Amino acid sequence: MCPPTIWEKGGQVGARWSLRAPEVSAMAEDGSEEIMFIWCEDCSQYHDSECPELGPVVMVKDSFVLSRARSSLPSNLEIRRLDDGAEGVFAVTQLVKRTQFGPFESRRVAKWEKESAFPLKVFQKDGHPVCFDTSNEDDCNWMMLVRPALEPGHQNLTAYQHGSDVYFTTSKDIPAGTELRVWYAAFYAKKMDKPMLKQACSSVQAAGTPEPSVSVEPERGQWVCKVCSNTFLELQLLNEHLLGHLEQAKSLPAGGQQHEAASEKEPDAPRMEPPTAAESKSIQSVMVTKEPKKKPRRGRKPKASKVEQPLVIIKDKEPSEHVAEIITEIPPDEPVSATPDERIMELVLGKLAAPTNEASSVPKFPHHPSSTIALKRGLVLSSRHGVRRKLVRQLGEHKRIHQCGTCSKVFQNSSNLSRHVRSHGECAHGDKLFKCEECSKLFSRKESLKQHVSYKHSRNEVDGEYRYRCGSCGKTFRMESALEFHNCRTDDKTFQCEMCFRFFSTNSNLSKHKKKHGDKKFACEVCSKMFYRKDVMLDHQRRHLDGVRRVKREDLEASGESLVRYKKEPSGCPVCGKVFSCRSNMNKHLLTHGDKKYTCEICGRKFFRVDVLRDHIHVHFKDIALMDDHQREEFIGKIGISSEENDDNSDESADSEPHKYSCKRCQLTFGRGKEYLKHIMEVHKEKGHGCSICHRRFALKATYHAHMVIHRENLPDPNVQKYIHPCEICGRIFNSIGNLERHKLIHTGVKSHACEQCGKSFARKDMLKEHMRVHDNIREYLCAECGKGMKTKHALRHHMKLHKGIKEYECKECHRKFAQKVNMLKHYKRHTGIKDFMCELCGKTFSERNTMETHKLIHTVGKQWTCSVCDKKYVTEYMLQKHVQLTHDKVEAQSCQLCGTKVSTRASMSRHMRRKHPEVLAVRIDDLDHLPETTTIDASSIGIVQPALGLEQEELAEGKHGKAAKRSHKRKQKPEEEAGAPVPEDTTFSEYPEKEPEFTGSVGDETNSAVQSIQQVVVTLGDPNVTAPSSSVGLTNITVTPITTAAGTQFTNLQPVAVGHLTNPDRQLQLDNSILTVTFDTVSGSAMLHNRQNDVQIHPQPEATNPQSVAHFINLTTLVNSITPLGNQLSEQHPLTWRAVPQTDVLQPPQAPAAPQQAVQPQVQNEQQQMYSY
């Protein structure tokens, strides 16, 4: 008896399917209640409850399964049901500020069917949004359960887009038991076209005067403008808003008339009142952060002259860190008549002390330094008697932090932060202010648009479409507006860095670059101008001493003189013709054409400038970068290098220049160590300090000790040990015991300092601190040799090894050496064959991630870079440049060391070696070292001197299509035509000198014989009177049979590399089991292979009517593919499988007499001889 089948409303099946289900479904749909029917197969009827005969049905339901949204909830969160029946996410434990959740996971659709209470989108680069469908809990994670905030006080999470995902970040500390409520970040809300949460405004009094004490207090973290009562979620937005009020106040007329005019036009406008004492205290707390808050002094009346004029705005382009602190001297208890702009400024500063609900404003303020700096930008306090600016270090000991509120990235100044903040709105059309007129692409920065126009909408040649040409860089544009916007100034690089002498096209780029060099520490004693380097300051100070008149621009304009005569004119180098922006830069460049007068006393290397020499010292002492400034100067001074440049071409007296070497006996000074050494040896008869290893001499003992570090492996003087402290584990040298002990922490293996961004761990805290510079992407360590910037000192030290040629990391497989360990590890992966990175689009694997990323461009953007010579396409510009360099850039003709073939490009040489000498690429010399001497195969053991074969230069110029046609033509030649092929000119083949060009042209041709198991083929002729065949004749008719070896190689054709006659006395072959011999007939073209030593014996024959040739194949694969000794490889293991040749096919040479020494015939033995064809 079968169990009954259960049907539910809507046709859903309980036990199994029935054909009558649709009828039951229709019956159920007519009723208002859900009806469940039971189909009984015994009585063939439906029952609404149970069958009278069989009884009730046992119901089995599925076990309860949580949805994806509820099962993905973190352990420190829980879902609670509220009183109104809704559900919310609550914190089980306290969540600190800046805690990030995400990414938000859901099904992504192009458009919503129904918008949810808290819609989310992701804006792509093309501007089209992708919507998040949060209708199904099984498609989303727990973040869909977080309810949106309705008021600012409820919000504790901020939603924002980062990349192609959406994240939630806590905007304040969330205590345990608090519900999580989310709303959009400021810029994300602008993209989503959603309003920001606003605080309810306070009621305005009947008189129209707003009282700050009566205003409604905003929630924590909200900022209210006291001028217009607008509310802002972030302090930076309030700052930018307040600057607009200040601009309006600045444009109004000053004095009491302004006040009256404003009252007449706007009768309902609130009157401005003097600030209260509390507001004045707030002003002081904002302005002075370096010292603790002090109570205002009582009982002292201020002087009338102390009253300051209102604050005004000046447009300052300098970064915010160069703006001085502003200290106002308005007494807090002295009421002053306030103008509207003063009142606005007081409201601004009074509000900026802290949010209005904060009880203590001063301790909370240091947490918002970036906002204060952004507001103080450009504010200068002026007086009637002039401008007074007091420079105070900003924020004292408090470190300035410019942090992005969206992604938490930290910047050095507010201008970089403001530029970065716009990048978060790069996908929203509303945030992009600059539009490309050609492709309508939007950009948030003007610099990005300029770069886009120069790269995407310009060419280097003028044509009918691109007819607007830039006079500076030569680029052409399709539209005139694009050329005007381009505004190229690349050739007019008039701004030079004083630290590293690099040139920049704009002053703003130079200012950004100067931040890499740190603070300006050296001031001119005459004009107090600050410099980064002391030598540059001294050079500047000489201009004052020389009486150079400093002319102000105002004086020139007043006198009517032309400004052109004082403008820096471009100057060209008289030696090389290079043009510089001014004569001073050209004079610095002229030093490169002169003598290298600054010599390293340790290694003897010479330099043009002393600052480059001082940077070079880091190569010898790796830990010198860890010293502070005082220790570094003292240590460098010990080895005889001063911080001043000794310019021999200077017009000043010798006494004005500092000297490095001073004689203690006669008080004479010298600029170079060699001059000082010569002086003490000739005048005072002193020997100095000599190195017993390299026999160099030094005047100073400290320089001698520093030099001895080079000979650290063979130190003769025990006193030098105080300068040398080697590590017993790795052998690295340190100049102090403290640095050595600190270095030993690396070898303990304990890495207790982890990076929070990438998870990498380090043994020391200073190593972690140095590693953090990698994430900042600031390259402040410049190479003194090439000017390349590095992120860390460690990277600079390794980079300097490239200039020195130091390669200390060796591959244990192929013994190739590298300067950096990371490059060696990448190279070693090629030996292991490990490929950890796979392309998810095509399944191809790679050993390096960057190689895989480059490969993915084939699937995404395709091959966009085309070679103008051969029309090959490449993914990246670098690959195209590499192709042109290797393939099309002609170099001096190179000859193959094995066969003498000449090629003109590196790619041709690589192709030649791969096709003609594949064993050189596959077999290393190290693999043959363990073999016995008797098995070594070389030219002496074979007894054949190979001729030097090569191709003519004219033949190399032919394309590969011409070569293919030439090969096809040669294969169609008849045997009698091939018999007339010439022989290369050689001392052995002197009877064929006139036919060398024809022969050499055919030797280098490509064939199908890319054979791994064949190293060399020597073809010899039996009769010197018979014309020798060409290199490919006689082997093309060999019967092809698949050959199985240990390596699994197969080949179809063979290519000889030398052709000649075999004579008994001078060309005797020393055959062994490693040589495979093929005997072939020059007339019929048939061939036989011999694989034993006694198969071919050379002895004179009376006459050779049917001359034969012998080809000897020297097999190197048998040396490396088998462990068996060489003598047993062919005879016992038979690594090659041959097919026997019938005896009737064996060529039997006639036994006619012939002159000895002139005809050589291979003796073919009878039944015992094994002859095979392939």
UniProtKB/Swiss-Prot annotation:
Ranges annotated as biased composition (Acidic residues): 644-655
SUPFAM superfamilies hit by this protein: beta-beta-alpha zinc fingers (SSF57667)
Composition skew (Basic residues), residue ranges: 292-304, 962-973
Disruption phenotype: Mice die before birth and show early postimplantation developmental defect. Display reduced embryonic stem cells (ESCs) proliferation and self-renewal capacity. Show altered transcription of naive pluripotency and self-renewal modulator genes.
Localisation per UniProt entry: Nucleus
Any one of the GO BP annotations: methylation
PROSITE patterns named among the record's database cross-references: SET (PS50280), ZINC_FINGER_C2H2_1 (PS00028), ZINC_FINGER_C2H2_2 (PS50157)
Listed GO CC annotations: nuclear body; nucleus
EC numbers on record: 2.1.1.-
Protein name: PR domain zinc finger protein 15
Source species taxonomy: Eukaryota, Metazoa, Chordata, Craniata, Vertebrata
